[in-house]
Amino acid sequence: ALCGCVVASIGSSCGITYLMGGDYVNVCHSVKNMIANLTGMICDGAKPSCSLKISSGVSTAILSATLSMEGKHVTAAEGIIDEDVDKSIRNLTSIGKEAMCNTDDMVLNIMTHKCN
């Protein structure tokens, strides 16, 4: 599965952008920056490593908000990002819902077959 902490940090980036004086367009750009940057980070069920992923999410939220406020954002020419922010979000959820099933199985297999 996609790391829930990282996905939740997209909302943090929106709030940070708003607090920096951003408007709707800035918030949309921040969301696109987040999706482009952190999509694919998996949940491995290892709670101590969650703090590392939270740190990645928070620092990327700040970076994405700052870039957005400077007028910089990932465009539809790159990766899974679409011109429409809602479509970009749907692309992210499709990856989480459909593409991560095999990843979940592999992570579980690795965790249950360790020799520690």
Describe the predicted segments one by one:
Residues S9, G21-N116:
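Functionally critical mobile loop/hinge segments
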Residues G15-I16:
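Alpha-helical transmembrane segments of multipass membrane proteins
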Residues A1-S9:
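Aromatic-lined, polymer-binding surfaces characteristic
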